Each structure stands twice: as C-alpha cells, then as structure tokens.
Amino acid sequence: MAVQKNKKTRRRKEKKNIEHGCAHIKSTFNNSIVTITDVNGNALSWSSAGGLGFKGSRKSTPFAAQMAAETAAKTAMEHGLKSVDVFVKGPGSGREAAIRSLQAAGLEVTLIKDVTPIPHNGCRPPKRRRV
C-alpha cells in the first residue's frame, strides 16, 4: 500500500492596496537596511545589502544601499505603493544613494527626515581604537 504525502497548501501573499507609506533607511558603517511600511508601521517589504549577497566591506558601500532600496521599492510597488515619506537613521555612506534609488524606482518622495538617535550624554562610548 502506497503512503500518501500530506500536501501543504501555501497561501499566496495578498496584494494590499496602499498608495502612501514610509521608507525607513538604516545605514550603518557595516550594512544598509531598507524597510518600506504603511502609515501605521506594518512592513510591506524590506531588503538589506547583506541579504542581496554583498559580503564584508562591500555591504557598507553606496551601491549596495542603492540595490537594497531598489529591491525593497519594487516589491512594495507590487502592493500599489506610489509615494513615501523617508526616514533616515545612522551615519553610513548609503544614505543619499538609497533615497536617490527610491526616486529612480518610481516612488514619489514627499518627505525626508533624519531620525538618527543622538544621546543627551547617555552611555559612556567605547574606548578609542588604536590601529
């Protein structure tokens, strides 16, 4: 008697119809992460330089941030996204490149805001590097 396999039914991602959203760009010295959300903060799509196959010091380049923003924008535009508010966080080199590639992908940028956390003299910073 043949044993029958249980077939798992995969649900397809439903296409949300969202016209305006937010793009959160986190650009550090090591990597760049782009998350596109709706106005409430629910993620529509995300992409990172490391997730696209960039390794080591190539993750922190402006080109890697550009590719990450492009990939996130394309998948978000499948949900009907047309315009975004951009929130940039971090001191990395991919900040401007990511914003430019969001515009090049066809999203209308309505606002650019820097939300980098700045301490009001909080924790003691790590000791200086001696190279």
From Swiss-Prot:
Keyword check for Signal: no
Cellular component GO terms, alphabetical: ribonucleoprotein complex; ribosome
Origin superkingdom: Bacteria
Gene Ontology molecular function: rRNA binding; structural constituent of ribosome
Keywords: Ribonucleoprotein, Ribosomal protein, RNA-binding, rRNA-binding
Pfam families to which the protein is assigned, alphabetical: Ribosomal_S11
InterPro entries (UniProt xref): Ribosomal_uS11, Ribosomal_uS11_bac-type, Ribosomal_uS11_CS, Ribosomal_uS11_sf
Gene3D superfamilies per UniProt: Ribosomal protein S11
GO annotation (BP), single: translation
PROSITE patterns: RIBOSOMAL_S11
Role according to the record: Located on the platform of the 30S subunit, it bridges several disparate RNA helices of the 16S rRNA. Forms part of the Shine-Dalgarno cleft in the 70S ribosome.
Subunit structure: Part of the 30S ribosomal subunit. Interacts with proteins S7 and S18. Binds to IF-3.
UniProt family annotation: Belongs to the universal ribosomal protein uS11 family.
Name assigned to this protein: Small ribosomal subunit protein uS11
Organism: Clostridium acetobutylicum (strain ATCC 824 / DSM 792 / JCM 1419 / IAM 19013 / LMG 5710 / NBRC 13948 / NRRL B-527 / VKM B-1787 / 2291 / W)
Annotated gene: rpsK
